[in-house]
Amino acid sequence: MAAATGWERSAVYYTPVLPGEQELDSNVSHEKNFIQFIEEFVIDNDFIYRTQLRDNLVVKQYMLNIDLRHLISYNEDLAHLLLSQPTDILPLFESAVTTVAKRLLYRSQENASTNIPTCQVTLRYDANILPIRNLTASHISKLVRVPGIIIGASTLSCRATALHLVCRNCRATRILQISGGFSGVQLPRVCEAPVLDGEKKDCPMDPFIIDHSKSTFIDQQVLKLQEAPDMVPVGELPRHILLNADRYLTNQITPGTRCVITGIFSIFQNKSVKASGAVAIRNPYIRVVGIQMDSNDGSKSTPLFSEEEEEEFLEISRTPNLYDIISNSISPAIYGNVDIKKAIACLLFSGSKKILPDGMRLRGDINVLLLGDPGTAKSQFLKFVERLAPIAVYTSGKGSSAAGLTASIQRDSVTREFYLEGGAMVLADGGIVCIDEFDKMRDEDRVAIHEAMEQQTISIAKAGITTILNSRTSVLAAANPIFGRYDDMKTPGENIDFQSTILSRFDMIFIVKDEHDETKDRNIARHVINLHTNLQESSETLAIGEIPFDKFRRYINYCRHKCAPNLDAEAAEKLSSQFVAIRKRVHQSEQDSNSRSTIPITVRQLEAIIRITESLAKMSLSPIASEAHATEAIRLFLTSTLAAATQSSPEVTEEVKKIEASLRKRLPIGFQASYRMLIREYVNGHGYSQHALEMALQILSSKETIQLRNGGQTVYRSGV
């Protein structure tokens, strides 16, 4: 064979005749790959997507939910293409699903050409979440996962996917396909229909009109997603972004729901911006392709715990003195207040929610009110709980309105329609609302949360919107008495500026007093000084047996989701008999003082003790709340709510005043007397109660009129 000539050795150059063919071929191959994935993907001998699609088609739902992990394991290149170019690839995926749906519906070839609605593909994706404030221009047209709270939802509107255009002059028709999201459409300005039989074609500019009866429409809803309060940096305002949901993703979610949105980060041009001439400015939004939302029980969808974590938590639950360890782990920077810490622990773990056969719900969340003097660490408790609780919202009473706590009605700037935005009680659904300065709220604002605290719903009837929002939250509130400090010489009704309607909704009410005690003051001073000086070695100053913060938070979450204790017979009997005894005791106290108690003891308080009992059992992951749990719950209730309800009566106050005046005459300045001698003289001799004598000594000591020496055994007159 002859050697090749010179021109035969050189490279051959060619120009592609149809440059779009290569792209068309790749799209066809991608669609074929998607069809193979849907038809052939198997887990444990189950064609999961073929089965899911068939089940959906039976109930006339033209959709398929895809887990991207499955697509990655089947064809990694295809999955990467979907993640990086979702706007181009997702329509191919939907076309592939529609093709498979036709095959499943119509086995015979003659029916295969029958048109069915385009099937929607929704995606489930477990990649790292991206906060709203971290979305940048580099994420445009990429698939992102964004967490947050839905604060607004519009009514459904219809959006065209294919417009049927008709020329006014020659009646030629044309189908115009429209992409998804907020993208607009530009109608063709010239009719390009061919000239028939040599007729003169004289179609004007902008000849097309839309034939709505032959156009294709889908449902569309606009949502507003806001950053969750626990993800907002200190000092920053929460940011929000618009969401565009269509077809089967509409009406899936209500304001106040926490969720993770999977979608395509896109941009659109605002009409007002266009009018001002800023044509290069675009506003971001997310085209929703998947929603992962909370479960129906009022808490976040069940979190995932590893086997090692579960074993560790079970080991913690078997710790002998777990109750004390947990209470010591509550705000360890605060000295003392053991019962308040135990009550807050009960609030964090909560009781068991119950749904009765008739559909009535009984709340399991515990509400606690801290009422007392300034400087008793009430606000510090609230701040600690806000950081520790899995879901928490902190607000101050003075800066909170009824709409800010419940829900407000907003008007959409574009459509001029009204929509709901959830307030603090709605945003904290499944968690805890911390309300500081509870006494500074206006009465009409405080009344707004009555329904939220007991029925755990918020009913709205404003601006033509009538609906009910969930607010399954615990309330931890802090307040000051009427006079700033609690006055022992006055009754609870004179100290507390709350109506009995709101007080009865609190499971535990603590009167926190700043009492003068030299030993206690010395211990508090040492504790605070250690905190300020040993910041690097702060573990030495904290409580023994403290659980690390992150582990404690996970343990609370684990107990709330995995355990729902029930009362046993002995505990139920004990609670029943104790409630009757408590009611009798309060009734006797009311008769003695000839006035109704400000803090009512009603059936709500029996339910409160039951919830406290269940939360104590939940701390140790016990499925049964025993008599021991009931005993501790009753003790907590007696030291909090009942102690506040049966504070000094007018008769005791009168006794205290008489003893106080008598002691001033009895003890000149510089003289002293033994405590035993005063008991013999005032209690045994004059018939006063020992409680009144102790109160009188405490009041005189706080006024620095007397000093209690030798551990309170000697009373020394030191001043006027």
UniProtKB/Swiss-Prot annotation:
Please state what class of enzyme this protein is.
Answer: hydrolase
Q: Which InterPro entries match?
A: MCM, MCM5, MCM5_C, MCM_CS, MCM_dom, MCM_lid, MCM_N, MCM_OB
Q: Which residues form the MCM domain?
A: 322-529
Q: Which residues carry this modification: Phosphoserine?
A: S350, S352
Keywords noted in UniProt: ATP-binding, Cell cycle, DNA replication, DNA-binding, Helicase, Hydrolase, Nucleotide-binding, Nucleus, Phosphoprotein
One Pfam match: MCM5_C
Annotated ATP binding lies at: G372, D373, P374, G375, T376, A377, K378, S379
Highest taxon in the source lineage: Eukaryota
What assembly does the database describe for this protein? Component of the mcm2-7 complex. The complex forms a toroidal hexameric ring with the proposed subunit order mcm2-mcm6-mcm4-mcm7-mcm3-mcm5.
Q: Which family does it belong to?
A: Belongs to the MCM family.
Q: What is this protein called?
A: DNA replication licensing factor mcm5
Whose protein is this, by species? Schizosaccharomyces pombe (strain 972 / ATCC 24843)
The beginning of the lineage is: Eukaryota, Fungi, Dikarya, Ascomycota, Taphrinomycotina
Q: Which gene encodes it?
A: mcm5
